[in-house]
Amino acid sequence: MSKPVVLSGVQPSGELTIGNYLGALRQWVKMQDDYECLFCIVDLHAITVRQDPESLRKATLDVLALYLACGIDPEKSTIFIQSHVPEHTQLAWVLNCYTYFGEMGRMTQFKDKSARHAENINVGLFTYPVLMAADILLYQANQVPVGEDQKQHLEITRDIANRFNALYGDLFAVPEPFIPKAGARVMSLLEPEKKMSKSDENRNNVIGLLEDPKAVAKKIKRAVTDSDEPPVVRYDVQNKAGVSNLLDILSGVTGKSIAELETEFEGKMYGHLKGTVADEVSAMLTTLQERFHHFRNNEALLNDIAREGAQKARERAKATLDAVYQAVGFVSL
């Protein structure tokens, strides 16, 4: 029996954070034995916001090296760079013609990003969800690991797939969301009511995977908790967002349950919690960065992995695109 197909990807824009690691990359590693996994670096999506060309090239290879450092195995998974597979944009054009203007206008991420980048509200930003739909449908993905901020885009992907299938038969698998039960949402250190974001301009909110572990430890020790007297280390997202975020991070890094951590820190000060989180995260980053540099310093290996991954991805992508072109009436040669 064939394994379910899973596809996911990360933009090479901004340094990846511990939120990307705990919420995505580490979850992907666990999926490799049970699913047929395709993991891409979505550089086409990245240019919806202006990028420095050299920085984008460097960041793309950085992300590839981080994939490998985290344990994503090219022998088990297909790892590729989005722009190396032209079928993504070819399918996206066809899907654009089966997607309505009003549907795109309702996308909350477009509204958010266009407000932040008012000087560059481009058509690519507007149709971003259609390219994302093409990314997913091209590989007949059954499940897509998504965070809360991408659920709306997966819903429009399902709508497009169902619309196309109703017209032309069951050409596309209709994907389901895969939302992990734990580690899916790491919050900002200083503003724990909002998600940690690699694009946050206040870098004290963010734990970057490639940051100096000592600098990260200092950030964690300055993280927001609360003013309860006496201090109570308890998981309560509504009333103790900062403490809950630190517990989530510590649970993700150590593998201990929230209940175990609450018992461990019963009667202790917030400084004790912060110190433990800082030590555990610093140790994890040190190990991860050693593995990262091992791969990043071998650019020939990275290029080989990207090339082989693109070849494997294109085999699957071409089969889907050929079927779509046949369905809509294009002449084949």
From Swiss-Prot:
Residues the record lists as binding L-tryptophan: D135
Presence of the UniProt keyword Ribonucleoprotein in the record: no
Record-linked SUPFAM superfamilies: Nucleotidylyl transferase
Pfam families linked to this entry: tRNA-synt_1b
Enzyme class: ligase
Record-level GO cellular component terms: cytosol
PROSITE patterns: AA_TRNA_LIGASE_I (PS00178)
Nucleotide-binding keyword on record: yes
Predominant subcellular localization, coarse grouping: cytoplasm
One MF term in the entry's GO annotations: tryptophan-tRNA ligase activity
Motif ('HIGH' region): 12-20
Binding site residues for ATP: Q11, P12, S13, G19, N20, G147, E148, D149, V186, K195, M196, S197, K198, S199
CDD domains, alphabetized: TrpRS_core (cd00806)
Family designation: Belongs to the class-I aminoacyl-tRNA synthetase family.
Subunit-structure text: Homodimer.
Described function: Catalyzes the attachment of tryptophan to tRNA(Trp).
Protein name listed in UniProt: Tryptophan--tRNA ligase
Taxonomic source organism: Pasteurella multocida (strain Pm70)
